[in-house]
A protein has these predicted regions:
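Enzymes that bind and transform nitrogen-containing heteroaromatic metabolites
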Residues: 1-163
Length: 163
């Protein structure tokens, strides 16, 4: 069974900050990358094209916004939770997930196996949070590891405690 790891990049006050080389390394080591529509558009526009060509990318979306018809991008529409359960059950490997919408989908449906939080030592302010969702699966999350990485960033890995 595949493991789904949600990556969250946040400021000290919980606001979103851009992903960095930690995400790139996780994406390189994974079976595929899972993102939401907003993250897909942001990545595409920031790079003036699609930079994630080595891996299949799954984009959870309400419709088709395909700007990358020649790349390895697949759009997950309809019942995304059911499709992700099917993908998770098929084979081995890690799915690297990123984006607030993706995080909400995974956590609200009990699909995330691990959460990797990179906390950047800045205060951003504002109402938007890096992860805005309710944890509806009723499971407890425990810290599996925590360490200071370069530039004072803190990498914390949380894992589910299975009932």
């Amino acid at each position: 069974m595949k493991q789904i790891t949600l990556h969250v990049y946040q400021s000290l006050d919980g606001c979103p900050v851009g992903a960095d080389k930690h995400f790139d390394a996780a994406a390189d080591a994974s079976y595929c990358v899972l993102i939401d529509e907003e993250t897909y558009l942001r990545i595409y526009l920031n790079h003036l094209g699609w930079p994630l060509t080595a891996k299949e990318t799954l984009v959870v979306t309400g419709g088709c916004i395909d700007l990358t018809e020649k790349e390895r991008v697949r759009f997950v529409t309809g019942d995304a939770a059911a499709e992700l359960r099917r993908i998770k059950a098929d084979g081995e490997g890690t799915v690297t997930a990123y984006g607030a919408g993706t995080g909400a989908l995974l956590l609200d449906n009990g699909l995330a196996d691990d959460i990797v939080v990179i906390t950047v030592p800045v205060l951003v302010g504002g109402g938007e949070k890096a992860l805005e969702c309710g944890l509806n699966d009723g499971r407890t999350w425990v810290v599996r590891s925590s360490k200071v990485v370069e530039d004072g960033k803190i990498r914390t890995v949380y894992g589910k405690v299975c009932p």
